[in-house]
Amino acid sequence: GVEPTGAASMKASLEAGRVVTLDKISTIADGVAVKTPGGQVFPYIQKNLDGVIAIDDGELVDAFLDVMEKHKMVVENAGLLTIAALKHLDFQGQNVVSVLSGGNMDVITISSLVQHGLINRGRIFTFSVQLPDRPGELLRIADLVARQNGNIIKLDHNQFVNINRQ
């Protein structure tokens, strides 16, 4: 089985040997975020499941970016749990099926996941510099970024921030 670390109620229940209720839950996989697993399904899971892999939100962000970039698919976070879990398993030489489900995401959430995924992988980052208010200083920074094969996605420039206002 697999569930998010921030809502690992089944894992906690299996470890306790009984259904337990978590005090709180916190995960981006809201489709599977439950404090208490179902009492009717618990005995079946307890009897038939080898274990539960807990996936943190960072792993879900990475899985989202992988699926979007490599397969051009939008899969909601709960549906990505099985993809993220594959990195925890040794299945070399075996056939594996992973069910991808749900694409119910708004574009702001998609944008946020892409940005966090790129940041997590070191593909984008933010930096801040204070420059003298002279012509060419901004060009000097842009040239430095370009020489490193970088690209500037967003630039905030306030030439008045350094003025001495005594």
Each PLM stretch: what is its role?
Residues 1-21:
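Glycine/threonine-rich beta-strand-loop-alpha-helix active-site module
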Residues 15-21, 71-73, 116:
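Short, hinge-like loop/turn segments at secondary-structure boundaries
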Residues 87-115:
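Catalytic phosphate/nucleotide-handling subdomain of diverse soluble enzymes
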Residues 17-31:
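N-terminal glycine-rich dinucleotide-binding loop that anchors FAD/FMN and/or NAD(P) in oxidoreductases
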Residues 107-166:
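A conserved regulatory-domain signal marking ACT and ACT-like small-molecule sensing domains
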Residues 11, 57-58, 74-78, 151-158:
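Flexible, glycine/charged-enriched surface loops at secondary-structure junctions
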Residues 3-8, 28, 36, 58-60, ...:
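Glycine-rich beta-alpha junction loops
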Residues 38-94:
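Active-site-adjacent helical/loop segments in soluble small-molecule enzymes
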